[in-house]
Amino acid sequence: MERVFFDYRKLAGRIKEKYGSQKAFSDALGISEVTLSNKMTGITYFSQAEIEKAVRLLELSPGSVSDYFFTQRV
């Protein structure tokens, strides 16, 4: 099966806007900074529970979730 890679640039911008750093956001999300970095670079994927929590923490509208988490890299 072909691996799908997602573009998290918009997510990274929102994290910086709301939390100032990936470290602060990873702490709020309850994961390590390394784990968040692995997810943001496509080494591992976000779980559904992590996406749900991130949506709340980042105050994303339900309709915008795909823009932040499911935009494929081209």
Per-region residue spans from a language model:
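A short, Lys/Arg-rich alpha-helix, primarily the initiator
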Residues: 1-20, 24
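Residue at a beta-strand N-cap/secondary-structure junction
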Residues: 19, 45-48
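Short alpha-helical DNA-recognition segment
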Residues: 19-38
